[in-house]
Amino acid sequence: VVAILGSSGSGKSTFLRSLIDLETVDGGSIAIAGENLCKDGVYVSKKEKAKALSKAGMVFQHFNLFPHMSIRKNLMCAPLLNKQGTKEEISKLAESTLAKVGLLDKIDAMPSTLSGGQKQRVAIARALMRNPEIILFDEPTSALDPELTGEVLSVMSDLAKEGITMLIVTHEIGFAAQVADKIMFMDKGYVIDYGTPEDVIINPKNERIKTFLEKVK
């Protein structure tokens, strides 16, 4: 688990979006689970790109659920399009995946009936449906009321315990210190520190990071 920290506008979300082709890069190389997305600033073919992107799941800040579909259909939509199995198999997968985030009783509900925390847990389940090698989280709790944040962080903590690889952009410093194996700190578009939570945020040596942590306490 890698947590990406930094002030607003430091490039965290842009970096994350670049990894799944939602932003275009003009230099460098990106590979997901050994599959190239771009090399030396040149993107691979459409087919190779699809193969690389199939290795990653994404959880956005604002849930992005289809409002006119039930939770079951929201989870089944992409797997059906990608022919991951029969309709019955994918429906059962939706049930087991939703149970993992504690929302099996909401499987036939509509998104409008769910709280923000529940919607984000559904979004996490949707990302898990693809059985990805890595899940990217773009500030998954920033759109939630403080009292709803805990339920989402709890699900993410459980995923970390299962050994699921995650790259998390977050402002939840305490959560990052507890769950992350590594912390990446960004400032003005650059990575200015990378290491264990102990080295980067518990006993920081970088003055910029010290200033940041003092302001968010």
Predicted features and spans:
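Helix-to-loop junction immediately C-terminal to a conserved catalytic motif
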Residues: 20
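ABC ATPase "signature
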Residues: 194-195
